[in-house]
Amino acid sequence: MSIRLENLSYTPGARKEKHRKGRGHAAGKGKQAGRGQSGQKKRSTVRLGFEGGQNPWFRRVPKRGFRNFNKKEYEIFNLSDLESRYQYGDTVSLESLYLKKVLKKRNLKAKLLAKGDLTKKLTVTTNAFSIAAQKKIEEKGGKIEVR
């Protein structure tokens, strides 16, 4: 007999049939379906945060505060940062502040505060500034532009 495509078959025992669990006693894996005795572990899973009947953490700890989603977050920098990093007559932009490592994040808004002294005329472009910082810059002949 020659071996032909229609004559081929698997060796007996090479392919096992899939057990369909929980489909009656006659199927061999009925009733408890290989999960042992009845109880919590037989069922699906316990919900997230469940502590076995003990009062869970999110109910033990009191509610406190809230998060203001309208809050504007600024990365702050001071006049002392500008004094040490810029020359007379330079233009200070958010990009140059980031490149000179004054600002840690590129896309966050920035606010200029008045800590330190300024001895140079600078043109500063920023998102926000304090009134004291504005006065110190304008005293030296500089300008502040709001982005």
UniProtKB/Swiss-Prot annotation:
- Note the Pfam families from the entry: Ribosomal_L27A
| A single GO cellular-component term on record | cytosolic large ribosomal subunit
Q: Is the Ribosomal protein keyword given for this protein?
A: yes
Keyword annotations: Ribonucleoprotein, Ribosomal protein, RNA-binding, rRNA-binding
Q: What is this protein called?
A: Large ribosomal subunit protein uL15
Q: Explain the purpose of this protein.
A: Binds to the 23S rRNA.
Q: Name one GO biological process term.
A: translation
**Species name for this entry?**
Mesomycoplasma hyopneumoniae (strain 7448) (Mycoplasma hyopneumoniae)
InterPro entries given in the database record = Ribosomal_uL15 (IPR030878), Ribosomal_uL15/eL18 (IPR021131), Ribosomal_uL15/eL18_sf (IPR036227), Ribosomal_uL15_bac-type (IPR005749), Ribosomal_uL15_CS (IPR001196)
Molecular function (GO) terms for this protein are: rRNA binding; structural constituent of ribosome
* Disordered: annotated span: 1-46
User: Its domain of life?
Assistant: Bacteria
Q: Where is the composition biased (Basic residues)?
A: 16-28
UniProt family annotation: Belongs to the universal ribosomal protein uL15 family.
Q: How does it assemble?
A: Part of the 50S ribosomal subunit.
